[in-house]
């Protein structure tokens, strides 16, 4: 009997190991920013922008799969390839841009998580618990797990948090599920009329949904995860299935968040600007249990994205320098410690530094077109890809993604300019 149980556990562990790179990407992608974007879309426009999510997830899968295939064929990560085959400056740009983005994300994510926990604590404690204490708790939790230096332990803990997040948001979907006809109608591309008082046009809301789903950091870190897994072109099917699993779950979770907001706030004619605000709006409509489930999902989303966020910069430095990824080295522990402390900025000062916000917005705007352009260049090189060069159809799809990324870059840079001129 013990032997049988041991075999079952072993098979489960082996099955989990196949999807760990995808789970890492899922945790990285579904954070408080994407939750806010999807919830706002659902609250303001119901499920009419569901097609945007479908298109975003398709683009994300397409890019993840092709970047992963590049690493399977060449054995190189994205930063290695940029440095070696394009120009070292391109690799350095990605290192700086993603590093600044991570710093801004850590501040924002931990600020939102701490605020949500504070709002939640008000329901069972008079005056609640100050956000700083929650931020310190989650920062310490992530850093202690990182300190172990064991990638497998880290990945399994992340898988547990992602599973909790998925369960919470799926439960919310079934609690607030819109009519099936509404879901089907949302798959038909259309732009609804702007909602009075929304503050954002449906086009801007759609662009924010794309921006939080089609994220360059996913594609760059994907190559690192594929190389770390030890996969070669012989495991292309496993790599593709892992990417499909990750993006499929990404769609289900994001659609569930939209549906929760559409089935409550949109029907009631209520609007929101932040994830924490949604808790107060939901309670009179759905009750304390539903709010608690949604809050748990939000917290899990924040924590699951915090893990990859603090690891990303050290991993990218290792990639660019060609060094072994040993996170027990003092220099990497110091980098992660400093990045982790940035999570206290918003709870303490109630705002992110304006310089970080501007730089993060600017880099995010231009990095996606560059990521697509680099892939088109590298994956068409016969000397690198041999018989695995991009097909005509793949080049056409990438060209379409590139054009759309230039459009979102224009919107992003316009937002940066507005921020600068309003100072």
Where are the language model's segments positioned?
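Hydrophobic transmembrane alpha-helices that form the core helical bundles
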Residues: 91-125, 135, 302-321, 352-359, ...
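Flexible loop linkers connecting adjacent transmembrane helices
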Residues: 2-4, 37-40, 65-90, 117-121, ...
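Membrane-interface loop-to-helix entry segments
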Residues: 137, 146-178, 361-368, 390-395, ...
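Transmembrane alpha-helical segments of multi-pass small-molecule transport proteins
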Residues: 121-147, 164-169, 326-345, 368-377
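Juxtamembrane transmembrane-helix boundary signature
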Residues: 25, 52-83, 93-107, 261
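Extracellular/periplasmic helix-exit of transmembrane alpha-helices
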Residues: 61-73, 226-227, 248-277
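Hydrophobic alpha-helical segments and their helix-loop junctions in multi-pass secondary transporters
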Residues: 163-194, 206-207, 212-224, 374-383, ...
């Amino acid at each position: 009997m013990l032997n049988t149980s041991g075999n079952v556990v072993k098979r489960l562990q082996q099955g989990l190991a196949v999807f760990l790179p995808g789970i890492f990407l899922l945790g990285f992608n579904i954070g408080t920013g994407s939750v806010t974007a999807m919830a706002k879309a659902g609250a303001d426009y119901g499920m009419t922008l569901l097609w945007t999510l479908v298109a975003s997830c398709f683009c994300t899968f397409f890019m993840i799969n092709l970047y992963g295939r590049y690493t399977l064929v060449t054995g190189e990560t994205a930063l290695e390839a940029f440095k070696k085959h394009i120009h070292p400056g391109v690799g350095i740009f990605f290192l700086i841009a993603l590093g600044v983005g991570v710093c801004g994300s850590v501040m924002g994510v931990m600020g939102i998580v701490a605020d949500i926990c504070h709002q939640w604590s008000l329901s069972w404690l008079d005056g609640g618990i100050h956000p700083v204490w929650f931020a310190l708790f989650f920062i310490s939790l992530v850093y202690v797990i990182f300190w172990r230096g064991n990638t497998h332990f880290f990945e399994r803990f992340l898988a547990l948090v992602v599973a909790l997040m998925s369960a919470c948001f799926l439960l919310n979907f079934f609690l607030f599920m819109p009519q099936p006809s509404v879901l089907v109608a949302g798959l038909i591309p259309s732009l609804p009329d702007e909602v009075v008082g929304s503050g954002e046009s449906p086009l801007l809301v759609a662009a924010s949904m794309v921006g939080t789903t089609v994220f360059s950091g996913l594609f760059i870190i994907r190559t690192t995860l594929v190389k770390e897994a030890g996969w070669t072109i012989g495991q292309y099917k496993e790599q593709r299935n892992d990417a499909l699993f990750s993006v499929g779950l990404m769609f289900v979770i994001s659609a569930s968040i939209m549906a929760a907001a559409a089935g409550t706030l949109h029907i009631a004619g209520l609007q929101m600007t932040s994830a924490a605000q949604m808790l107060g709006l939901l309670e009179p409509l759905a009750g304390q249990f539903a709010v608690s489930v949604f809050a748990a999902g939000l917290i899990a989303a924040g924590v699951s994205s915090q893990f990859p966020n603090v690891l990303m910069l050290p991993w990218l430095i290792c990639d660019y320098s060609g060094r072994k990824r040993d996170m027990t080295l003092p220099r990497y522990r110091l980098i992660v410690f400093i990045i982790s402390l940035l999570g206290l900025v918003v709870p303490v000062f109630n705002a992110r530094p304006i310089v970080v916000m501007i730089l993060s917005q600017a880099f995010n705007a231009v990095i996606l077109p560059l990521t697509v352009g680099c892939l088109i260049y590298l994956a068409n090189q016969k000397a690198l890809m041999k018989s695995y060069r991009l097909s005509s159809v793949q080049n056409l799809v990438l060209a379409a993604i590139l054009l759309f990324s230039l459009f979102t870059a224009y919107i992003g840079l316009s937002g940066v300019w507005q921020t600068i001129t309003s100072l």
